[in-house]
Amino acid sequence: STPREDIGASMLITEDLSPKVNVPVEVVPMEELEKVLSSSNNGTIVTSRYFLQPLEKVAKQYGVRAIAVDLSDFQKELTILKKLSTGSCVGIVSISPGLLRAAEVIIHSMRGSELMLMTAISDNSSRLLSLLKASNHIVCDGPSLSVVENTLLKNRSQLMRLPQIICAENYLSTETINQLKKEIGVIN
């Protein structure tokens, strides 16, 4: 669960967890969580550390657990970005506005103004197209990859060059997924 304004983060968590835990995983915005829990007698709330404190109160009220998951360290992607030539234009595409904001801060702290950064939510087609036209490299999350690839295919004639696509395979760290599996009792 995350706030409605960044439900994309919940969707990324769900995308990583669903195939790895053999229990139903449902995306519920924080604003609707009490309503959902009032009609259910069990469950586990999974969120990022940023939202754990308010969700622990809700969990306690309804007798369920709230567990924070840790994000990937994105070392593969950051290593690639560290090696890019000064002046390169990098596009970041995600379903999560929170992830985009965090990525911008991290990349700026790492490279300063050496790289030109552009960001787009994957469902904002006009902004995405502008980003694809300008960028040498695109970093995207898993759910955005097909949108990026389809937009590139549809608009190839408008592009001077095809950008290199770097897809972040995991949103959550492997360790946090394994820990969560232990917590909920689904270790293989």
Model-derived features with residue positions:
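C-terminal regulatory/effector modules of DNA-binding transcriptional regulators
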Residues: 1-188
